[in-house]
Design a protein with these regions (language model features):
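Conserved N-terminal structural module of periplasmic/extracytoplasmic solute-binding proteins
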Residues: 6-7, 20-92, 108-109, 293-294, ...
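Extracytoplasmic/periplasmic solute-binding protein
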Residues: 127-131, 136, 162-217, 262
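Glycine-centered hinge/linker elements that transmit conformational signals in sensory
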Residues: 165-166, 211-247
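Conserved C-terminal helix/tail region of periplasmic/extracytoplasmic solute-binding proteins
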Residues: 146, 170, 367-425
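Short, solvent-exposed loop/beta-turn-alpha elements that line the ligand-binding surface or hinge
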Residues: 102-115, 180, 184-187, 202-228, ...
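Hinge/lid segment of periplasmic solute-binding proteins
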Residues: 88-139, 143-146, 283-286
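Short helix-initiation/N-cap motifs at beta->coil->alpha
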Residues: 62-71, 158-160, 244-259
């Protein structure tokens, strides 16, 4: 399929070059296939602003949550393919690196203030660059914690989190709110548990081995799956929604938190703009799960939001796309809109972020807490791997038996080895 796409795009480029005289005055155009649904409204606004300022046409299409790879595959097969897309991890580099322009020495690469989030292919080509720095964990409404007769000081480890969450759930009818918002397992939400929460298994394996991963390991030990179970069980069994109803989705966890129906919301810093208006003192705590010494745990910090430019776009479209990227990170008005939604952007002329959750991440680090790196970015054959985990978790939510949890562990640990072999065999 990808060879066919590459051939089609090459033929389109040859045709464009042959007709170059007809397009001598072409300013080029931009087609941004956006990865983040929460950014869509702002992205559409920015596209309109840029077109009005420059005359360059900018099209923004936002993939539905959990469908980016399918959407990218479909869109790349079209004559008017995206000129700006996302390659967010090493699996993406393997799959889409050949479609990415080498950004080394470009104007957008020169705007970076760090190369920590850059992704390179095996030939050393800079195929994608990070456009925001994020963190994730458990978002908390301190007012509801206090209303339930508890204190944020109790939330320093799994034992404290469990005590508070179970106490709130037991009194949910009386209090008028529950502990956790819904933990839906449909495509719009399951990534919070199969991509993010599962990261605790990977990071604690790294810490046990004494080094962070620099490449995808062939196998996992599974030594921390009981800790993953601790936190997952706490989320689904002390919630507004019965675990048996999570598979089909349809619950709005963000709205549940914003409207004061739940004290805890498993998510990340990208939610700050959405929830802070309703819960201005919302804060974020780590994935406490019962690991020894977790009182010194911090938040999960990193990114999988990395821009790539289509190698097979016309020269005019490539130039227009890079110019648009530079404008997003350097124009004061445009950048302010981006930072409001995304938080920290790693560029020289980007404004400072006021994102409270990123401030929480910094505070944990300054207090000497260890950071959870985004080891989850190494998930092999990510879509297939996560699909297997979703299937097992759905069976477990329907019937929380030991046998069904064993299937979850198989999907997470044996499934990793299976997908690694498929990706590297």
């Amino acid at each position: 399929m990808k060879k066919t796409i590459a051939l089609v795009l090459t033929l389109v480029l040859i045709f464009a070059l042959a007709c170059s005289s007809a397009f001598a005055a072409d300013k080029g155009s931009v087609y941004w296939l956006n990865f983040k649904p929460e950014l869509d409204e702002t992205a559409q606004q920015l596209a309109k602003m840029y077109t009005e300022e420059t005359g360059v046409d900018v099209k923004v299409v936002t993939a539905a949550s959990g469908t980016y790879q399918q959407t990218l595959t479909s869109e790349m097969d079209k004559k008017a393919a995206p000129t700006l897309f996302i390659i967010g991890n090493q699996a993406g580099v393997k799959e889409w690196g050949e479609f990415a322009m080498d950004l080394t020495g470009t104007a957008i690469a020169d705007e970076l203030n760090t190369d920590a989030y850059n992704l390179y292919d095996e030939d050393g080509r800079l195929v994608s660059i990070g456009y925001c720095y994020e963190c994730y964990g458990i978002i908390v409404n301190p007012d509801l914690i206090e209303k339930a007769g508890h204190s944020m000081d109790e939330l320093k480890n799994f034992e404290g989190l469990k005590t508070v969450a179970e106490a709130i759930h037991a009194r949910a009818d009386e209090l008028g709110f529950d502990a956790f918002s819904s933990s839906d397992m449909d495509g719009s939400s399951s990534w919070r548990f199969t991509g993010h929460m599962i990261n605790l298994e990977y990071v604690y394996e790294e810490r046990e081995a004494g080094a962070v991963w620099t490449e995808c390991p062939a196998t996992l030990t599974g030594n921390y799956m009981e800790n993953y179970k601790n936190l997952f069980d706490l989320c689904i069994n002390n919630s507004l929604t019965d675990p048996k109803d999570l598979a089909t989705g349809g619950h709005d966890a963000e709205a549940e938190f914003k409207t004061g129906k739940a004290a805890f919301f498993v998510n990340g810093s990208w939610e700050y703009a959405a929830v802070s208006g309703d819960v201005p003192n919302a804060t974020m705590i780590p994935y406490y799960c019962g690991v020894e010494g977790e009182e010194k745990a911090g938040l999960n910090c990193g990114t999988e939001n990395c821009w790539a430019v289509n190698e097979y776009a016309s020269d005019a479209d490539k130039e227009a796309t890079v110019d648009f990227m530079v404008w997003l990170v350097s124009d004061p008005e445009a950048n302010a809109l981006m930072v409001e939604q995304l938080g920290i952007m790693p560029y020289k002329h980007s404004i400072e972020s006021s994102n409270g959750f990123l401030n929480d991440a910094a505070a944990y680090t300054e207090d000497g807490c260890y950071v959870f790196d985004w080891a989850t970015n190494y998930q092999p054959n990510v879509d297939e791997y996560r699909a297997g985990l979703v299937s097992a978790l759905n069976a477990y939510c329907a019937d929380q038996s030991d046998a069904n949890w064993a299937l979850v562990k198989t999907a997470a640990i044996d499934g990793w080895a299976t997908q690694y072999a498929a990706a590297n065999g």
